[in-house]
Every structure is written in C-alpha cells, then in structure tokens.
Amino acid sequence: EKDKLINIEKLLEKRVIGQQDAIEKVSKAIKISKAGLQDPDKPLGSFLFLGPTGVGKTELSKALAEYVFDNEKQMLRLDMSEYMEKHSVSKLIGSPPGYVGYDDGGKLTDSVRRRPYQVILFDEIEKAHPDVFNILLQILDDGRLTDSKGKIVNFKNTLIIMTSNIGSQIPIDDNFDYTTKKNLALEELKNHFRLEFLNRIDDIILFNKLSKENISAILNNQIQLIEKRVSSKGISIGFTDEAFKYLKEKGFDPLFGARPLKRLLQDEVLNPLSEVILDIGENIEDKLIFSKDKYGLVIANKNLRVLRS
C-alpha cells in the first residue's frame, strides 16, 4: 500500500489519459490525507471534477477506488438525475418512520455503514435537489451523517467526489494556464452552487478536452484490456496499423471524449470477436488479426483466412 501511495500519480497517469493537471492535484491531496495531515473529523478528501463528457472523470474515480482502497468496486456511484425531487432524499438516508421504505434504509448510509472505506461518486451534482446539498454539507463539515433511524454513519474514511460539466462550454483559450481556466470555471460555478457548498470542497479539479493523441493512448489501453480478457481463452489478438488508425480516427469526437471510441470497440471489435469465439469454439486459431478493408474491420486467422467481415 505504501508503494501505491508514493507512486499514485504515475499509476493514475497510466490509466487516465490526458489529465496530468487533475491527477497531480488529486494525488497531492490524497498523500496529505493518508499521511494523517487532513482534518480527522472530515472525509479523506472531497473534490468537484469539472469537464465535458467522456474525458475521464468517472474513470479517475474508479482508479482512486482501486489505488486508495485496493479495489475499483469500492465505489458507490449515485446518479443525481435520480435525486431531483425533494422526496428523493429519503433514498439516500432512508424514509422517515411510518413511511413506505422505512425498513429498507438509505442507499448512501447503508452502503457506507457496510463499507466504510470507499469512494462515493455524486454524478452530475448540478441536477441534485437542494436538500441533497444539505446532506452533503453535513458530510463535508462533520464527516458523519444521521440516517432516518437516528443512527450515525461515519464518512471519515471515504473519498467524496462530485462531477459536473458546468463551465465546460465556456470558450477557453488553450493557451490559458490551469489557474486562469479554473478561475473562469469558478465564476460560472457561483451561478449554480451556493458559496457555502463550494467553500467546503477540498479542491475543484478541471479536466481537459481530449486530443487525437490522447485517444490513441486510450485506444492502446482499451486494446490491452481486451487482449487480457481473450488471453484467458488461449487466444491472442492483433491489429494491423490500418485497423488501429481506423479505430483511432472513427473513435475521435472532441465533443464526447472517449465515449464514441468505447462504443466503436463494442460494435466493431467485441461483437464480431464474440461471434467468432462462439462459432468456432475449441477449434479457434490461437492468433486472430484485425485488419481493415473498404467496409470496415475484418477478422482473420494467422494464415490470413477471413473469419468475420
């Protein structure tokens, strides 16, 4: 664990591409906390991740769960579009006595009671009802929360992360430094959030838009993950330069970050690959090559016999 924390910045950079500034700031805050220099009555850290869709906000949250808590599944994701109504607060802390769902408990409080060491991700926080922010203020202030049954839940070993794309539409010159960009975003945030809320967050972290070079690196990472999955079946896969270039070009969209690339890999790599594996079964060749023809990607065996086009 000690080595993980010392090298957390390098580990995060391998997994989350193109966000060096964000990773540096989060890593420093994590080290302060794990060294015991953070306020002991507050969560380990609290961050507001700002940036457009598909640039790595959720991926960094998962990576923090893995490197800080040893498992990326040590994360509770709460979609704030499901907490837009006043009554939805009861889903977080449980329904009041006498109401339907009282015995079920709250999704947030029950999760932290069962797993006190985890990342809690409030996704698209700007969509939450104001009463949700009152709950967040309690967590950020006191590191604890009282559920509907009057039981106190300790949040002092959690990482609180909120995401938003507020400010991502502001026309910002790429030559601006990080501080200038952050100040512009902060002015926009003040139009949406109360100052008492913003002031309680440890840091507001800006995420960059992804470049073509970033997409190329992300594609490499995704291919390695696919290779790892299929290797368990005794199969190896490869991509020609033309196939890699095709995926990189078609998967790049500056508006939606890496999301189009992941959908493309699902449609043009995983779906046809699964058909080949299911069709051929145990007789499958040990090496499959993805190449490019005029219609798209083609899967061939090591002797270049086409298996799927």
What are these model-derived regions, one by one?
Residues 1-309:
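AAA+ P-loop NTPase nucleotide-binding core of proteostasis motors
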